[in-house]
A protein has these predicted regions:
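Small-residue-enriched flexible segments
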Residues: 1-212, 217-261
Length: 261
């Protein structure tokens, strides 16, 4: 549960600062988590560690969902309610996608919505979306409620959690990196819930980066940059690799690691 407006914070981050982090996930109600800063303990807010430039800091965000069905343009919306998609009731579009899925995916982890990050792209795939949950639907109006506000004209595509796709995306993003250490913020919907065994993401970082200096936490939402902007993600592994030998490592850009209540 979130007691801090992470979206507002991320919207104010200067473009020359990189933020990686996550929402504390232990509590079942707002204010139930405990954040520690030096000798002080807080029940809301955020705690951040600012790292200096020049330490080879490289961010990474790997997705945990796979797009299904076709992308649709939102043609009717109100707050977090999608009223129509491509001129048809959103619930009808949702039902069409569900009916096209294999039985194992239909009965599995539920359907999510991906909100396109870069509308200038002509095609969309894994990694091109902000993932949000489908919260419910109204049969009478055909509206679908999701875990985010959405504007008319936005492109969305329904998504399913997919272990194979998630594993490939993380492995691919780590393939060309070596690092001395990494701080990893992984969704609590990954791990054994997605991969069938604990420690999948940590193991990938250890094996691919060639280091055992990997630390982090399970999150109820992950923070990381995609497409040059910072976003609050779902079902991702967001990490800051340190001491990289990557040619894209930081060029005097400070990094912030944040835990949000």
């Amino acid at each position: 549960w979130q007691s801090f407006d992470a979206d507002a914070l991320l919207a104010s981050v200067p473009p020359d600062v990189t933020v990686i982090g996550g929402l504390a996930s232990a509590a079942d109600r707002p204010g139930g988590n405990r954040l520690v800063l030096d000798d002080a303990v807080f029940s809301d807010g955020a705690v951040a560690l600012v790292l200096p430039p020049g330490i080879g800091a490289v961010p990474l965000v790997a997705q945990g969902c796979r797009p299904v069905g076709d992308p649709f343009v939102v043609t009717g919306a109100e707050a977090n309610l999608i009223l129509t998609l491509g001129g048809q009731p959103a619930l009808r579009r949702l039902q069409e996608v569900i009916s096209s899925l294999p039985d194992d995916e239909r009965q599995g982890n539920g359907l999510h919505v991906g909100i396109v990050i870069d509308e200038n792209r002509s095609t969309f795939g894994t990694g091109d979306f902000l993932i949000r949950g489908v919260l419910g639907a109204d049969r009478e109006s055909g509206a679908v409620a999701i875990g985010a506000r959405v504007e008319v004209g936005t492109t969305v595509q329904f998504q399913v959690r997919d272990a194979a796709s998630a594993g490939r995306d993380l492995s691919s993003r780590l393939r060309h990196h070596r690092a001395k250490s990494a701080i990893v913020f992984t969704c609590n919907g990954r791990g054994s819930h997605l991969f069938g065994a604990p420690g999948h993401d940590a193991g990938q970082f250890v094996d691919r980066l060639g280091t055992t200096d990997v630390a982090g936490m399970h999150c109820a939402g992950e923070i990381g940059p995609v497409g040059g902007l910072h976003h609050l993600h779902g079902f991702t592994a967001s990490a800051l690799m340190l001491g990289t030998d990557d040619p894209l490592e930081d060029r005097g850009v400070p990094s912030t690691v944040a835990e949000v209540g």
